Amino acid sequence: KSFALTLARLGYDIVLHYHSSSDEALQTQAEIESLSRKVFLAQADLTDPTEIHSLVSNLQSLDVLVNSAAFMPHGNVDALTLENWDTALDLNLRAPFLLAQACASKMTEGGLIVNITDVGAQKAWSRYPSYTVSKAALESLTKILARALAPKIRVNAIAPGFVLQSDIVPAEEWERLIGRIPLKRPARTEEITSALEFLIQNQYVTGQTIVVDGGYSLV
């Protein structure tokens, strides 16, 4: 949502993808329209390659693609199910690749692809193995795509740190994690979205991951 609103404020019309959160999508649509921008809702299951290609085939042109959909299953290595492993890799890694592959042909005047990774890609989170692996691989994919699609299309990643407390993280664990951050607080939403603004405005940056984590990856 925040990335879509940022793009709308920068003057872009928006294609807003959602899977099952139709109420939230409609609310975001209204917020974007209040900024006098056009917005088109696109429902799709991004773990299904057929639905990805159907979604992209309806686009005439594209300037910026933000890959932010993610699945973060909790579970140690000995407890993680094959289903959760596959879903995490399909949504967090395969979908961004297929979207980049399909959308590149729509960026006829050049464009920007931004993959949303995670500070977890810099760490070894044993309680989120499939998520951590997928995000680390997505950063590698970002570099590969940047070389493959240059000079017409730039490809970068943003790796946020902690922003909002997840329902699966107990309050005491959240406080412990925040206490480890050198800047001693979670990120504000606008501190993450400003990285997207930077990548749009600076057209000499490609193949890079912008880490916005308050220094957490240092500890």
Regions of interest found by a model, annotated:
Residues 76-77, 81-89, 169, 177:
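Substrate-binding pocket helix/loop in short-chain dehydrogenase/reductase
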Residues 150-154, 206-207:
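Short, small/polar-rich loop/turn modules that mediate ligand/substrate recognition or access, typified
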Residues 68-73, 214-215:
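Conserved NAD(P)H cofactor-binding loop of Rossmann-fold oxidoreductase domains
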Residues 100, 134, 142:
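Active-site helix of classical SDR
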Residues 106, 188-212, 217:
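C-terminal substrate-recognition "lid" of short-chain dehydrogenase/reductases
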Residues 105-106, 146-151:
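Alpha-helical segment proximal to the catalytic Tyr-Lys
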Residues 1-15:
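Canonical Rossmann dinucleotide-binding motif of NAD(H)/NADP(H)-dependent dehydrogenases/reductases
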